[in-house]
Regions:
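Active-site histidine-anchored catalytic micro-motif
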Residues: 65
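Terminal accessory/targeting
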Residues: 1-60, 68-189
Length: 189
């Protein structure tokens, strides 16, 4: 809801779009000014497109720029996750608490940032793995290779540092040594 073009026809969700027909990039603006019925229409269209293209439900619901944690969008995301019977990403304790109260599944802990410096260097990964709390933790990562598609992203070149960190043999060894079980959202119970 905060980057690119919608799946829905622009005329059906005008409160979500700028004059060029693209989503406003500001999650707080979207939460404050987007019409809830238009948010729901677009989210349903995105899920329907996912199911049509992949032939299955998504493993979880997530939102770019964390827009899904802001009311009233959060309630729409929660209702859709309930309807689909799938978990969701919860970036903060308040969202996790609210999701848990509704019986929604989510990792118990969330770690990650996307600022001017790469977050998941090998050193930071090793430090987090050494002090990982009990339960399921999500590490929000943005690994990748810098290319023309990322020139205008504020988190472009940092992706290569994260890719190196996540594929560092020392990180894999730390995961094995600590008997950490890697999983995906579809495995949350």
């Amino acid at each position: 809801l905060t980057l690119g073009e919608p799946v829905s026809p622009a005329e059906e969700i005008p409160s979500l779009l700028d004059a060029g027909g693209k989503f406003f990039r500001d999650p707080l603006r979207q939460a404050a000014e987007a019409k809830p019925e238009e948010v729901e229409l677009e989210l349903r269209a995105q899920v329907a497109t996912f199911i049509r293209l992949l032939g299955r439900k998504p493993t979880h619901l997530d939102s770019h720029h964390h827009v899904g944690r802001h009311l009233p969008i959060r309630d729409i995301v929660f209702a859709l996750a309930e309807e689909l019977g799938i978990p969701l990403r919860c970036q903060d304790a308040e969202t996790r608490r609210a999701a848990s109260e509704r019986g929604l599944r989510s990792p118990e802990h969330f770690f990650g940032e996307s600022g001017p410096e790469a977050y998941w260097s090998s050193e930071r990964l090793l430090s987090h793995l050494a002090t990982l709390p009990d339960g399921v933790s999500e590490f929000m990562t943005h690994p990748g290779c810098f290319d023309q598609d990322l020139v205008y992203s504020r988190y472009g070149r940092q992706r290569e540092v994260e890719l190196r960190g996540l594929t560092d043999p020392a990180v894999s060894e730390a995961v094995a040594r600590r008997r950490i079980h890697l999983c995906h959202f579809g495995q949350l119970t």
